[in-house]
């Protein structure tokens, strides 16, 4: 299990525990469960990289303590 921080830059900061084998789509569903938004509306970015739903955290080399930027579409 790794812990990831998600910040929407509007004051909401969420910590999520997940497995490295989880996909970005799975992570979005965990974020949606904690924030109360629909997972389809969540966009995860870091700088200018937009993370795709079907790729795993391990493939993106996301590790313990990683910070995502949370956007809504």
From Swiss-Prot:
Disruption phenotype: RNAi-mediated knockdown inhibits expression of hsp-60 when adults are exposed to conditions causing mitochondrial unfolded protein stress. One of its GO terms (cellular component) is cytosol. GO terms for molecular function: protein tag activity. One of its GO terms (biological process) is mRNA splicing, via spliceosome. The keyword DNA-binding does not apply. Residues 1-73 form the Ubiquitin-like domain. Induction: Expression increased by citrate dietary supplementation. Its main location: cytoplasm. It is found in: Cytoplasm. Keywords: Cytoplasm, Ubl conjugation pathway. SUPFAM superfamilies: Ubiquitin-like (SSF54236). InterPro entries: Hub1/Ubl5, Ubiquitin-like_dom, Ubiquitin-like_domsf. Interacts with dve-1; the interaction occurs in a mitochondrial stress-dependent manner. Involved in the mitochondrial unfolded protein response (mtUPR). Plays a role in modulation of lipid metabolism in response to the citrate-induced mtUPR, acting upstream of transcription factor nhr-80. This is Ubiquitin-like protein 5. The lineage of its organism: Eukaryota, Metazoa, Ecdysozoa, Nematoda, Chromadorea. The gene is ubl-5.
